Amino acid sequence: MPVLSLAQMLEAGVHFGHQARRWNPKMSPYIFTERNGVHIIDLVQTAQLMDEAYEYVRSASEEGKRFLFIGTKRQAAGLVAHEAQRCGSYFINQRWLGGMLTNWTTIKTRVERLKELERRQETGALDLLPKQEASMLRREMEKLQKYLGGIKQMRKLPDVVLIVDVRREYNAVQECHKLGIPIVSLLDTNCDPDEVDIPIPANDDAIRSIKLIVGKLADGIYEGRHGQLDTEEDYEDYEGAEADYDEEIDFEPEEEETEE
């Protein structure tokens, strides 16, 4: 039985690609037709490739491999955080900071700084400081939580990266290539399939499409780790996709040269 039925994908709008004039010719094998100037994705191929992707992440999870979900676009941010946490994985859903993987040593120092500030907050140590200093440290902690909270427990580089939009996450894709980290990703009709290892042709803009695909990948990871899936009733639908997204960026990690 396929992981996704054609009915499920049609209902979620997985088949809707971009306007034909915005396509990437390399996606031609995955396009069924053009309708009213919009490319329609071949859902038969999507179903087959989704089965392969599901088995890939399930098997990798069963082997103990760790996953990083990346989705920083507004309609993906909340879903990415929710599904990654549900299957015990890491996530980045606000902004990709340059060198997050290739310069992991520097990023890790910021993660440790976050943990330190959280410990001081929990023990009440911040309350003993002058009001202005405590306020400054709390603001620093909140910024670190926003941009690095999803990788707070990540002790080493991930084994597999799952991406919602490879065009938007171009820098993350390049870092994965440099480090040899395999990429599983949705591929809309304007994407380059050569950039990923495990492609899933699908609408990467519609919330319902993203939720369906990312949710099933999370199911595969969960199944590999725990042996079976819990029932759907054990998880509430996540409706805060856009509420958890903040476009304001004013945190940058310390500058450091990336090792070649």
Curated annotation (Swiss-Prot):
Domain of life the protein comes from: Bacteria
Ranges that cross the membrane: none
Gene Ontology BP annotations: translation
Coiled-coil positions: none
Compositionally biased tracts (Acidic residues): 230-260
NCBIfam families: rpsB_bact (TIGR01011)
Cross-referenced HAMAP family: Ribosomal_uS2_B (MF_00291_B)
Name this polypeptide is given: Small ribosomal subunit protein uS2
Organism: Cyanothece sp. (strain PCC 7425 / ATCC 29141)
